[in-house]
A protein has these predicted regions:
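Acidic metal-coordinating catalytic centers involved in nucleic-acid phosphodiester chemistry
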Residues: 1-11
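Structured alpha/beta reader/binder surfaces that contact nucleic acids or chromatin modification marks
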Residues: 18-180, 185-189, 198-204, 210-246
Length: 246
């Protein structure tokens, strides 16, 4: 059985350029910074966290991490970048500096308008200072780690596993699906992935239920899962998150 998505998602997916990661997902130190950024329609980040390979950035999404925003964590707001500038931290007057040098270089992104996501993206597993994704994933992800998927293959397989695992076959029976040269088998409490009949990796169904994205990485074993230019994306963390030095 082949992994098939709804027709509207198929149409969007066909137009995605997976090499284009032009959405900056940034974190926040506190609620005051969130308010200042929303009111002033801007976001700022240490220049060291954005490499030349990460440019250009066309959108910014605000990740309210569980540690800083308990009870209201996730991505609720995003916006298109109107213009950007390399500035000194001391020039960002909307948010008073509490540490570091006022001469430290920062990128300041002016946002056309902050827009609410129709369905907020909920945190699960992943923690990072910043990450880069694409607009398709931002508009379709249910959980934060899904923003880190790096190809159409990964997206299709991950969503199909999310759909099937809750209804995994009882002991002694099996089910599965395929996409191009990838075959996934659910049997005997485990998930196994094969490419061209060669085993890639496996994980338990229970581990996928508890930590789906970490388990998904195991299915790819020695094969690179996250495909993007520049430094690799952060590894998934299970229990905590980090905020940037903003």
């Amino acid at each position: 059985e082949e992994a098939v998505l709804p027709s509207d998602v198929e149409a969007q997916l066909a137009a995605v350029n997976w090499d284009r990661r032009d959405v900056l997902v940034g974190t926040l130190r506190n609620a005051a910074q969130l308010k200042a950024c929303l009111d002033g329609r801007f976001y700022y980040i240490p220049a060291a966290l954005v490499t030349e390979e990460d440019k250009p950035i066309h959108y910014v999404a605000l990740f309210q991490t569980p540690r800083v925003f308990p009870g209201h964590a996730g991505i609720f707001w995003y916006g298109a970048v109107q213009h950007s500038a390399l500035v000194q931290r001391g020039s960002i007057l909307e948010v008073p500096q509490t540490h570091g040098s006022p001469d430290a270089p920062y990128y300041r992104y002016q946002i056309c308008q902050w827009l609410p996501l129709p369905t907020p993206i909920r945190p699960r597993e992943a923690g990072f200072v910043r990450a880069f994704t694409n607009l398709f994933l931002l508009e379709n992800a249910e959980f934060i780690p899904e923003l880190l998927l790096g190809s159409e293959e990964e997206y299709r397989l991950f969503l199909e596993l999310k759909r099937r695992v809750p209804a995994a076959p009882p002991e002694g029976t099996a089910s599965g699906f395929a996409w191009e040269d990838i075959r996934v088998l659910l049997a005997d409490g485990n998930i196994r992935m094969f490419r061209a009949e060669q085993a890639l990796g496996s994980c338990s169904i229970q581990s996928f239920i508890r930590y789906p994205f970490a388990a998904f990485r195991q299915l790819y074993a020695g094969q690179a899962l996250f495909q993007r230019a520049g430094p690799p994306l952060p590894r998934v963390r299970k229990a905590h998150d980090h905020e940037s030095a903003l």
